[in-house]
């Protein structure tokens, strides 16, 4: 339980995405590929067929693990709860690695990130990216915002890294009003256009061709936790060296099941 709590603290995606539990095998998630429409029909007229078409997204499981060895003396003499610290440290390690994969993972031996060319978010800027390779304008953030369909904007938020935050905090509209609005309540995120802003070190910096800001409803990113997450203490394996090992393992996958629900801003190449 301590490991799970630490993971949620360290990985922002676990707070924003849809987290499910799976037992075995791949999980098939049905997704609407195209939607039908209604039609105006004459009295006694034939109602035209207009079916939705469906596709599937398959979510599996990839193994993520970490280990640490501690001397028996340190474990016995420690003035604080060392096992509690180790659980939190494992949460930091695994949580950071998860977050990295959920953003830039290529789907090979790890989850598929929202920035991956295949199965990732859609481009919310022009085909050539922003007007500059080294900056972002007020209008480009506005374009990104409105590139996302209205139903998704209701639960949408921005994610970027700290250096991009620094640049965007300086943007003003034509009347001198800042685009960025700081939070007035402790524990709640700042906002852009009334949408929360979160930061991640794994979002690329502002540079030519980089995807630097992502905006969308991340509940359409599904994280599948395979049952069997473990946190083990190994008393015997390193006994000859006077050490105790601690191992944490988990199996997890993540995929964006509806790409149109998340958009990214890309710098000019």
Where are these regions (language model features)?
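C-terminal amphipathic alpha-helical segment
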Residues: 153-163
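Acidic/polar, low-complexity extended loops/arms that serve as protein-protein interfaces
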Residues: 1-155, 169, 177-180, 184-191, ...
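Short intrinsically disordered coil segments
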Residues: 43-48, 82-85, 174-175, 212-214, ...
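A short pocket-lining beta-strand/turn micro-motif at the edge of beta-sheets
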Residues: 154, 193, 227, 242-244
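Short active-site-adjacent structural elements
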Residues: 168, 206-208, 222-224, 240, ...
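Extended, compositionally biased alpha-helical segments that mediate assembly or anchoring
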Residues: 235-269
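Hydrophobic, well-ordered secondary-structure elements that form the walls
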Residues: 161, 197, 246
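C-terminal hydrophobic structural anchor segments
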Residues: 191-236
